[in-house]
Amino acid sequence: MSELLSFALFLASVLIYAWKAGRNTWWFAATLTVLGLFVVLNITLFASDYFTGDGINDAVLYTLTNSLTGAGVSKYILPGIGIVLGLTAVFGALGWILRRRRHHPHHFGYSLLALLLALGSVDASPAFRQITELVKSQSRDGDPDFAAYYKEPSKTIPDPKLNLVYIYGESLERTYFDNEAFPDLTPELGALKNEGLDFSHTQQLPGTDYTIAGMVASQCGIPLFAPFEGNASASVSSFFPQNICLGDILKNSGYQNYFVQGANLRFAGKDVFLKSHGFDHLYGSEELKSVVADPHYRNDWGFYDDTVLDEAWKKFEELSRSGQRFSLFTLTVDTHHPDGFISRTCNRKKYDFDGKPNQSFSAVSCSQENIATFINKIKASPWFKDTVIVVSSDHLAMNNTAWKYLNKQDRNNLFFVIRGDKPQQKTLAVKRNTMDNGATVLDILGGDNYLGLGRSSLSGQSMSEIFLNIKEKTLAWKPDIIRLWKFPKEMKEFTIDQQKNMIAFSGSHFRLPLLLRVSDKRVEPLPESEYSAPLRFQLADFAPRDNFVWVDSCYKMAQLWAPELALSTDWCVSQGQLGGQQIVQHVDKTTWKSKTAFKDTVIDMARYKGNVDTLKIVDNDIRYKADSFIFNVAGAPEEVKQFSGISRPESWGRWSNAQLGDEVKIEYKHPLPKKFDLVITAKAYGNNASRPIPVRVGNEEQTLVLGNEVTTTTLHFDNPTDADTLVIVPPEPVSTNEGNILGHSPRKLGIGMVEIKVVEREG
């Protein structure tokens, strides 16, 4: 209803101003600004829905306002371009319509009415309401009843007898199991669900709507609210350090806790969270690559579900035979948005909907088959009688190719339990949420029936039952939950440990690199993660007088304040204010100590603008003083005009990437010397090794041969045509995820470049 009202007010404002208001520059600008805000808000809502499926939620506050750099971002480039072009077209059309009768005399009354209607359209829009609620949740002091509902359980289970297998299905919400809506989509796992305790109304709350947040909610009974963006949790050294979570209780009760997944454990700080709460045995893509049958059988995120669940079964067998009490948690990935992935061993590789194949539904049908196969192996084993199997979604599906069909249904998360010791078949329609999962499992294992804000759905009353406005209540508790991190409020001294790549201050430890906004009563960490913008782009959003401490590679801040460090990959510390003074210090000791030093100086807005503009220069446009192209730092030497076909800097150098161009091209500002030596320090990837690699300057071509290890080769060129471009053509670029950013599409690697130097020859 509010959508229709806001749109009607918007339309009325446009029509009244266009046909009645007449000519007046101020009223035109004011009305266009407010109407433009309405458009931006609704496009933001549309974009947020595209990524989250839940409008402008807590994750969007960080993810969309920082950057979409991260998992699977290439698949969102076209929608992003479409939004920008659409926004430009709408603004142009809006301005043209409002100025249709600009030659008519100005009418104050109609202008005022049009502006008021425009303001009303903004106020009535769902996007404005969602953003307002999010902003309120950031500024609240908390809710006085939090302490009454947050309950810490006993740290042990009195007499544990059952082992636990807990399966997180990536985005595998219960909605997929509606056989009337999606016939024969989940027959294998659906049949198992119907054999156990099936909790049919598990709702999703704020702070539980992405993977690490869903894991925290289900194991600790609290949403993931933090003094930083949740997916940046990989930068912290401990995770809710004061809280008692399910893993802690299991470990204290004699369980060995295991976690197995196909993706990198560092993503979003899963390794930090699990190690902080009782898990001593973790297996991700790095740990599994030496033990899986085919280490090259991977998708954009890591190993496929069939591989991961095969390894989980081996671990279940091994642990069961040992007689040691254990818990085994695993997380699938094949159903990750936007399209999902199909394991090669499943029979259900294709699912048609609305008369055509649907990739997301196909991935769901395949993944549920793999999960069911794993569960049936456990059920057929002699150890099932001592085992509790839990299957849950980590969160509701985000915007995938099945999303519009899911939204037509009543959506809930998946949570069901199969007990080997006490088979029970029942569907429980009690209102509950993800935070109740851990408490329910703890209750089944013989422990307490509460865990944080979670309550057992077998013997307790969920917060979802107690509070009709549970989503608003959860946001009201946000400041209380953030305080559970025990995060420091001041930063006076700090220590950098180069061996551990950590910074420590006021009792807290963070992985590097890190940006901190420091005020009198608050220290706000801004880590760098797969989902966030690079730290220099985040710093560019600071106000002129905001105090900052920025710890990063020296070359990243050198172009601003320390050009002598432009080629250094060591750690440097910069601190100050963008509109005031800044200092850069080179970290030159293994354990390096310093103090914050913020001077209260006059703010120079010209300096501020210059700093912001420099911080926002994209990597490929950065230039530094050097007599060679150094590939392990961003940018290029001043002599280079532009380059293409080259991937991002890594610690050793950069790969060529045929996804960005079939050839490596380096165009110089001026013609290359008439006679010169080209000194190339590089290596080859895969089948490119030991093969001739053409290197061209103008009409002259030389051949480069590289191995898999870095070597230096000198090629001799004559350049009679004054060519200014160097071209290198890898013979067989290989599609691979090796060294790739998690979730990105595979790169096509050819040669790895460390340094290229042009040396003029006499004569």
From Swiss-Prot:
Transmembrane intervals: 4-19, 26-48, 76-98, 105-127
Protein name as annotated: Phosphoglycerol transferase I
Keyword Membrane: yes
Pathway: Glycan metabolism; osmoregulated periplasmic glucan (OPG) biosynthesis
GO terms of molecular function: phosphatidylglycerol-membrane-oligosaccharide glycerophosphotransferase activity
Enzyme Commission number(s) of this protein: 2.7.8.20
Catalysed transformations (reactions): a phosphatidylglycerol + a membrane-derived-oligosaccharide D-glucose = a 1,2-diacyl-sn-glycerol + a membrane-derived-oligosaccharide 6-(glycerophospho)-D-glucose
